[in-house]
Amino acid sequence: MMLKYLVLFIVLSISVHAQNYPQFNATVYDSSGTGYYFLVPIKMGPQGANFNPYHMILDSVGNVVYYKEFVSGLNTGDFKLLSNGLMTYTYLNKYYLMDSSFTILDSVNCKNGIQHDGHDMQITANGEYLLMGSENVVMDLSSYYLFNNNGSPGSSTASVKAVVVQIQDVNKNVIFEWHSKDY
């Protein structure tokens, strides 16, 4: 008898913990819509340190169908459904790929010293990864008079974060790299 109550208590505790997602209001303007909404709220700046980022999928009327919380102070993003049916998100300098049961199948990140940029990742029809990255470069911006809201010239040794687009094959070998600093 005691074992039955212990099992019931454990099951109830787990289900209560699973409902630990933040409260929100969903206003539905057109109930004829179908589909799902992928949400990734983030906080920027010092106040973000006490915020637990999360992924959430809502159905067309605002019911939670998926929720995953991440470590406080570390942002996640770009949570989406790809055209091949996989879901992807960025976290800790990688993109993770999940199937429809939310099982992580693989991860991919930029190579050749390129820094991870979590703004976009796509997979082509033939399985190649298109990744967005960045690199820090020093540039002479002294001929540009756009700075400090008063037309001041830029620095001759300005530190600039430049975009890099990287394409990797199915084995994650870099097959193409485009550097915005070159254009």
Segment roles from a protein language model:
Residues 18-183:
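Histidine-/acidic-rich catalytic cores in large beta-rich domains
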Residues 3-14:
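Sec-dependent N-terminal signal peptides
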